[in-house]
């Protein structure tokens, strides 16, 4: 295993500069064009070299399942432009709306935009910075259009600590994938508490493929490969992180990695949502470890998709010092965020970590940011265009550190000094408080639902709470923003919508009673409909009649 420095460091030698510049004259433009073409060719050649060079892999960590072998696919889409609308091309030779994206980099201009080459909401919060939420319009007079299954409910039994409980519906985070298939079908994909991944026609709610069974419940959100490979990535409480093919007669497991591939110290669930950047999958597990895995996606001689994964980096998310402070509950339940060439994750011990992944293909990912927020972080780190971090923290342990910092925190991971920018308190008194939901970035305001029943709007510059709405207690679902409309699900089974024309004073538009049970899952907004599951055992499509 590559050596990883666990020491604390906030300093990055060079911060990316973002500034304007005067337009050159015509001759300068011609010279610039030539330079750009030459540099572009060099970048493409370099990208191909990187993808063809064998990575450094740990000697003592191997994937537990036998993967499918294949010729490697061409270099993924590092030099292509990211799609931003139906009209924009994904080809760097025809698109004039977005700059080229270097391989293994998530540029600042991808914040708030869709990710990848297919049309769809392919992962939790839509992109690697976790800042894109779907496509409008948002319904204006919503009704339940259909629910799934037609009868009964999606329920399963799961055992934790010797206690067996029946779980129904979809849970936290539980956001569905919605995507436009090449055959014209809009498909919704989600994992559920009946120990299955389900595939539905977004128009009718009827199954599009057989459900994929797992050995235990699925709490987290699934990921559809963003580069067009017919692969779905998901974890389960059955200890497995999987890659599932979607180009066979039925969804088929291509590869699985067991959580005990390392010596974890909490449990073996996979709640976090995998993120894929140029053939590298990043994921954290409840075994308390972070992984960077090269997928080696390709196709066999019959044209069927294959993977041949290899672990590039495996890093414990904890330190001995952290365990001495908070105990052994240091699992990574949140999803990984990626910005430029940094990967961020947070764990249940309150540790927020940033890794430099510029040499991840060589098996290197040194820690460049390390900060303790004092309590459990299950919500996902959100990164804005300037690389600032928004961290939503629970209030369970009642530590002095958490009381000092607050429960919604903004951090500057690039500063040489104290990275703490501001914090908003949300204590729970004698009970739990704080946030399980992941923040949604708006226009100068960040929005979030709290366990204590508050829907907040917070100024991103000052940390001032500029707006607050009372909602149901235990609201863990993450709010979403589409077409200047904020949509929030509550634990009272409601969907609420607010007009963000004035982001500091949202105007209530409607409240829809979707279910009589708690909605813990995060909704997906897609072309006039809202898709989300409930703890009542059902999954819903909501829209205008």
Where are these regions (language model features)?
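Detector for intrinsically disordered, low-structure N-terminal pre-sequences
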Residues: 3, 11-13, 33-34, 55-56, ...
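Extracellular mucin-like PTS domains
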Residues: 64-97
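C-terminal region of N-terminal signal peptides and the immediate post-cleavage residues
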Residues: 42-66, 76
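Secretory targeting and sorting signals
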Residues: 29-49
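Intrinsically disordered, low-complexity segments enriched in proline/serine/threonine
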Residues: 4, 15, 56-57, 69, ...
């Amino acid at each position: 295993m590559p050596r990883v420095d666990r020491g604390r460091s906030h300093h990055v030698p060079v911060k990316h500069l973002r500034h304007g510049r005067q337009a050159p004259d015509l001759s300068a433009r011609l010279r610039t064009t030539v330079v750009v073409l030459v540099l572009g060719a060099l970048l493409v050649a370099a990208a191909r070299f990187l993808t063809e060079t064998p990575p450094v892999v740990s000697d003592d960590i191997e994937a537990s399942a036998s993967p499918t072998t294949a010729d490697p696919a061409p270099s993924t889409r590092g030099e292509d432009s990211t799609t931003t609308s139906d009209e924009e091309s994904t080809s760097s030779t025809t698109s004039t709306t977005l700059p080229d994206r270097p391989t293994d980099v998530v540029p600042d201009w991808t914040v708030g935009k869709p990710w990848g080459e297919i049309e769809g909401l392919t992962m939790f919060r839509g992109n690697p910075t976790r800042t894109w939420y779907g496509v409008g319009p948002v319904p204006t007079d919503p009704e339940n259009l259909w629910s799934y299954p037609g009868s009964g409910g999606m329920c399963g039994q799961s055992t934790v600590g010797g206690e067996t409980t029946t779980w129904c519906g979809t849970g936290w985070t539980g956001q569905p994938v919605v995507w436009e298939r090449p055959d014209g079908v809009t498909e919704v994909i989600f994992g559920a508490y009946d120990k299955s991944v389900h595939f539905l026609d977004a128009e009718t709610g009827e199954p599009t493929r057989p459900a994929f069974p797992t050995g235990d419940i699925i709490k987290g959100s699934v990921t559809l490969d963003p580069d067009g490979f017919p692969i779905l990535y998901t974890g389960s409480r059955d200890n497995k992180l999987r890659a599932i093919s979607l180009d066979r007669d039925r969804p088929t497991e291509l590869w699985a990695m067991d959580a005990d591939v390392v010596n974890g110290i909490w449990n073996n669930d996979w709640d976090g949502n995998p993120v894929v950047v140029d053939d590298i999958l990043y994921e954290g597990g409840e075994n308390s470890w972070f992984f960077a895995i090269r997928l080696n996606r390709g196709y066999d001689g019959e044209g069927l998709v294959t993977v041949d994964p290899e672990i590039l980096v495996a890093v414990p998310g904890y330190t001995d010092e952290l365990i001495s402070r908070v105990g052994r509950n240091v699992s990574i339940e949140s999803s990984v965020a990626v910005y430029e060439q940094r990967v961020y994750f947070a764990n249940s011990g309150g540790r927020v970590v940033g890794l430099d992944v510029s040499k991840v293909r060589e098996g290197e990912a040194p820690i460049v940011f390390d900060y303790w927020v004092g309590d459990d972080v299950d919500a996902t780190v959100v990164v804005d265009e300037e690389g600032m971090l928004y961290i939503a923290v629970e209030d369970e342990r009642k530590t002095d550190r958490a009381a000092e910092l607050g429960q919604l925190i903004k951090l500057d991971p690039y500063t040489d000094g104290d990275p703490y920018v501001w914090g908003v308190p949300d204590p729970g008194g004698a009970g739990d408080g704080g946030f399980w939901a992941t923040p949604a970035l708006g226009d100068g305001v960040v929005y979030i639902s709290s366990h204590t029943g508050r829907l907040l709007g917070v100024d991103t510059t000052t940390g001032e709470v500029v707006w607050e709405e009372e909602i149901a207690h235990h609201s863990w679902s993450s709010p979403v923003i589409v077409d200047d409309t904020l949509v929030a699900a509550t634990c009272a089974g409601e969907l609420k919508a607010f007009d963000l024309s004035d982001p500091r004073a949202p105007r209530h538009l409607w409240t829809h009673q979707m279910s009589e049970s708690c909605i813990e899952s995060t909704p997906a907004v897609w072309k006039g409909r809202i898709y989300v599951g409930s703890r009542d055992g059902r999954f819903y499509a909501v829209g205008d009649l």
